[in-house]
Amino acid sequence: MVDPVALARALIQAPSVTPMDHGCQDLLIRHLEDLGFTVHRLRFGHVENFYARLGSKGRNFTFAGHTDVVGAGDTSRWSSDPFAATLEEGYITGRGAVDMKGGLACMVAATARFLAARPHFAQQHSLSFLITGDEEGDALDGTLKVLQWLESQQEKMDYCLVGEPTSAAQLGDCIKNGRRGSVNGRLTIRGVQGHVAYPHLVDNPIHRAAPVLAAISSMTFDQGDRFFQPTSLQFTAVQSGGSATNVVPGELTAGFNIRFSAMHTPESLEARIRQVLDGAEVDYDLQMMTSGLPFITEGGPLVEAVKATVAQVTGLEPQLSTGGGTSDARFISRHCVQTVEFGLVGSTMHKVDERVPVADLEVLTEVYRRLLERLYPPQG
């Protein structure tokens, strides 16, 4: 039987900072092959990915996740080696403990326990794993390309659970049944460079930009709805000029990000911003790049099954949420209508001394195991 604690520690000890894998996926693959899964290793560029499937009939339930992690930063600030997976006082400390190697370990352990009680499961049903090594990076050679490969192989996912750390304060308090979209923008406002002592010979782009940036930052796109928070635009960088104090710069650049709901498209958001810019009569260039589209799984068998199972195991009534950042569910939901995210408490992810309670690993394993039981009840 697979021990989620031991597997989580082994995964953390592989320093798989994007895009390096360092044998992390091999650990998962060995366990899955032992359980009878057929594994397809899918390397795109410098990124390791794999898709594993057990069975070829019935509905296909997919566990999805990522083995890559963000860097540890200044390791001197950690209480222990970030890749030692230190086990102390009921916690495992290490990079990726909650995001999301702990969740991966629980998925595999739950699958092993479920199949031990259902040795003939694959004769009528299917289980699969979609695992990438490029979620924390640009996400160009990861899940997106695996999904393209699955489509070329006519592989279908009926249900998908992404094991991101969705819980807020307690394991089981939050399920993500959707995510906001994300668009990054770069705005350049051009003027005329010159000496500060000759204002009649310059056109100061900073002066031009100030009211424009204020107008854009105060835009109201919507009021939100029962699934999504109001759309939010935040400026992330403003740059103009150099170190000289007597030169009016020739241009100003500003970066921004928009998190938006399913009420909008990237094109409609860009049109709203251009409307403000055109009305300001400034010389500008606007570039916008979509990093993720919004999705929502409003209801259906998977949402209801996850809610009921979490409540059964944890005793909590989980809230459905679309808040927070983006995840690979934004890609998967285009291929699998029933896509939901549920996992560990994410309060320490990406931080110094990221850690997970050992007890939570056991509880999450039980949630995942009982979820499989609920979706695939014994026949007869």
UniProtKB/Swiss-Prot annotation:
UniProt xrefs under InterPro entries: Bact_exopeptidase_dim_dom (IPR036264), DapE_proteobac (IPR005941), Peptidase_M20 (IPR002933), Peptidase_M20_dimer (IPR011650), Peptidase_M20A (IPR050072)
Substrates-to-products reaction catalysed: N-succinyl-(2S,6S)-2,6-diaminopimelate + H2O = (2S,6S)-2,6-diaminopimelate + succinate
Pfam families named in the record: M20_dimer, Peptidase_M20
Positions annotated to bind Zn(2+) 2: 99, 136, 350
Known cofactor(s): Zn(2+); Co(2+)
Single GO term (MF): succinyl-diaminopimelate desuccinylase activity
Free-text remark on how the cofactor is bound: Binds 2 Zn(2+) or Co(2+) ions per subunit.
Pathway membership, UniProt: Amino-acid biosynthesis; L-lysine biosynthesis via DAP pathway; LL-2,6-diaminopimelate from (S)-tetrahydrodipicolinate (succinylase route): step 3/3
Enzyme class (EC, first level): hydrolase
Catalytic residue list: 68, 135 (proton acceptor)
GO biological process: diaminopimelate biosynthetic process; L-arginine biosynthetic process; lysine biosynthetic process via diaminopimelate
Entry EC no(s): 3.5.1.18
Keyword Metal-binding in annotation: yes
Residues annotated as binding Zn(2+) 1: 66, 99, 164
Signal peptide: none
Keyword list, A-Z: Amino-acid biosynthesis, Cobalt, Diaminopimelate biosynthesis, Hydrolase, Lysine biosynthesis, Metal-binding, Zinc
Family, similarity comment: Belongs to the peptidase M20A family. DapE subfamily.
Role description: Catalyzes the hydrolysis of N-succinyl-L,L-diaminopimelic acid (SDAP), forming succinate and LL-2,6-diaminopimelate (DAP), an intermediate involved in the bacterial biosynthesis of lysine and meso-diaminopimelic acid, an essential component of bacterial cell walls.
Subunit and interaction comment: Homodimer.
Record-linked NCBIfam families: dapE_proteo, PRK13009.1
Name of the protein described by the UniProt record: Succinyl-diaminopimelate desuccinylase
Species assigned in the record: Magnetococcus marinus (strain ATCC BAA-1437 / JCM 17883 / MC-1)
